Structure formats: C-alpha cells, structure tokens
Amino acid sequence: RKLTGKTNDATKQEVNPINHQEKTFKQKLMLFLRGNLFIPDPRVTWVRPSVRFLKKYLKEHPVDAIVSTGPPQSMHLIARKLAAATGLPWVADFRDPWTRMFYFKHLCLCGWAKKKHQRLEQQVLDDATVVVAVSPLVQEDFQTMTDTPVELITNGFDEDDFDQVVEPDGYFNITH
C-alpha cells in the first residue's frame, strides 16, 4: 500500500498476475516483490509467530493430528513445523496446486525463487503423513511428485445428505 498509495482492495487488483492489461512499473515491481520476497505467499510472515503460539497452545490443548489447508501455502509451512516439533500426524489439504497453478508462471520469479517454491512444495508433499487433493488431476500430479499417499476429496456435496429436503412451495426461500 505504501508503494502504490492505494487501499488494499485496489492494490490487490493492480498486482493481479493474470490481469492481461499492460502493467505499470509500480505494478511490475509489486508483482516481482510478491513473487521473489514473499515465498510462498504474502502470509509467510505468519509462519514464525503462528508456530511459536501453536506449540504452546498444543501443550495445553492436545490434538490427535494437524490439518493444514492451502492456499495460502504458508499454512502448510506452519503445519510442517508443528508436525516436526510434536510428532503428530499431518494432513496437508491442497485446494489448488502450488507450483503448477495456472498463475504461477506469471509471478515474475527469479530462478532461485522458483527453485525455492519447488523445494518448499516438495518438502510439504514428502513430510506430510497424507496429502489431500481437490481434483483427480491434482491428485495424479502430486502422486508423480511424492511417495506420500495422496487422497482425493472433491468439492461438492453428498446427495444423500439432502434426501429429506422439502420441495419449495412456489416461493423463493433463503435459508442459512
């Protein structure tokens, strides 16, 4: 925001890597910084304080397993450190791919930054107890990258959960 003078929402639009409009120098700089300094994503600043807090929290509130969901992929980095520190099993749930995401090639990455993304992705895939993918293609892709089991849980719903649904009475109903 300090570089652009824009609000958060405006800044996000301006540095959208897949926006095909010609980018200004500031936009290109923001995209370069985002891709090369904030690896794997801008939430990387959460990793250290989250791990510190959660280590203490888990001592007082034990759990059976750690589950991380990304993106943002930084959540997997938090979970990886917690799993290593606690010895707990870890489920890494990927809602989208990481380095094979369609916009990844638009991040203006230096060679070393691209390699760091790939190394972090590989560490997450290898160190998780199990990986969850959202689509068969992502599942197949991850299975070629790691020996860790990769399970498939697609987005959607189970029709059996809705077999008792009452038919609408002709009015538009909104429920929450």
Predicted regions span which residues?
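Membrane-proximal helix-turn-helix segments that form the acceptor-binding/catalytic region
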Residues: 74-77, 81-85, 98-99, 111-130
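Conserved donor-binding/catalytic core segment of Leloir-type glycosyltransferases
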Residues: 168-176
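Carbohydrate-associated surface elements
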Residues: 137, 156, 168
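Short N-terminal targeting/anchoring amphipathic segment
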Residues: 50, 54-75, 87-91
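Short beta-strand->alpha-helix junction loop in the catalytic core
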Residues: 154-163
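A conserved catalytic-core segment of Leloir-type glycosyltransferases
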Residues: 1-48
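A short, active-site helix/loop in glycosyltransferases that binds the activated sugar's phosphate group
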Residues: 123-150, 159
